[in-house]
Every structure is written in structure tokens, then in C-alpha cells.
Regions:
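Regulatory N- and C-terminal appendages and interdomain linkers associated
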Residues: 1-142
Length: 142
């Protein structure tokens, strides 16, 4: 499994290899075969990206331009239920500090933000939360 917000955030840096992308993998690719497949995919993606052109010109995208465009549409931080639930719980006791903290972060989801924010909120979901309804994923009642 892959954490797609982290995956696309890392991919938006247009990495030279798959090492940064591995931050988004829930299970580390243990086999050389898996690393090889991801590496081949990244090469193909970069070739396709190199062959695409800027909408406003016929010139190909530069890596820098592609990275900039991807970072505009792929937030680094997203509101996740497993971050929100503790904030709800604290708020029921009139402690809104975590709600405010999340609000500050999510109002700038594309920004790099501080090292502390990155360590706390730019990470994979803990494995113990995988099968807990309401924490593992958002629910939809529609």
C-alpha cells in the first residue's frame, strides 16, 4: 500500500531515484524486483513528463517547472481522520489547542512549514490504526 498524498508530494520534487518515494510505502519493498519495478516506473514517468509540453508554448516542461506545477496541485499536508479525532476529543473538553494547530497547518497545505510540523504531520498512518473505522479512513454517508 501507498500513502498517495505523501507519494505525490515526493514525486512533485521530480526525484532522480525511488528513495524519496519510499517514504510513502507502508511496506518497504523488500525484494529487488519491487525496487526494480518502481525504478522502471519512475523512468517511464520521467520520460513521459519530459515529452509533455507547456500549455502556453510548444516547449517541453523543465524539471523545475514540472515540480512547481505539481506542488501547486499536490498538497504536502492533508487533513486525516487520525489527526482530527484527537482534536475532536480534546475540543469536547474545551481544549481547542489541537484544533487550532490543525487549522494553522491545513490553511497552508502546500507550504513546507516547520521541521516540527513535518515530523508530526508528514508521516504514514500508524499500523495500529489500519482497521479502525472512523480513524483509518474518512467515511461517506451519501
Amino acid at each position: 500500500p501507498v500513502d498517495y498524498p505523501i507519494f505525490f508530494s515526493e514525486l512533485s520534487m521530480v526525484p532522480d531515484d525511488i528513495v524519496p518515494l519510499k517514504k510513502s510505502f507502508y511496506e518497504s519493498p523488500t525484494s529487488e524486483g519491487m525496487d526494480k519495478r518502481w525504478s522502471e516506473w519512475l523512468i517511464k514517468w520521467k520520460l513521459l513528463s519530459d515529452s509533455s509540453t507547456n500549455v502556453n508554448t510548444t516547449a517541453p516542461h523543465s524539471c523545475k517547472e514540472l515540480s512547481k506545477q505539481m506542488r501547486l496541485v499536490n498538497p504536502k499536508y492533508s487533513l486525516r481522520e487520525w489527526f482530527v479525532m484527537p482534536a475532536y476529543q480534546q475540543a469536547t473538553e474545551r481544549n481547542y489547542s489541537l484544533v487550532r494547530e490543525l487549522q494553522d497547518i491545513i490553511t497552508q497545505p502546500y507550504a513546507e512549514q516547520s521541521k516540527d510540523v513535518k515530523e508530526k504531520y508528514y508521516r504514514l498512518k500508524p499500523s495500529e490504526l489500519f482497521d479502525i473505522g472512523g480513524l483509518s479512513q474518512y467515511s461517506c454517508s451519501s
